[in-house]
Amino acid sequence: MDKTIKVILLMNSERLISEIEEVSADIGEPDCKLIKPMEIWEGPNLAPWMMDHTKQDTFMINSDKIITLADPTPTLLEKYEDCTK
């Protein structure tokens, strides 16, 4: 199965790049699985999302917290893949 890697803009203005999977869930339950999300900083520089708070690399979030999804540029995708090997 091919990975779906997207740039994600969250409602709190955080910009992430992550493998993302839609999962079935009950209403109100998290329905998006982020796998190895990286926060995008200026440059663009990447850092593991919530790295100061957890070693976890898989997160469940509600899709209503996502403003938009976009395809990453080839350069950003390559950088993400290098960081998540």
Question: What do the predicted segments below correspond to?
Answer:
Residues 1-85:
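Conserved RNA-binding domains used in RNP assembly and mRNA/RNA metabolism
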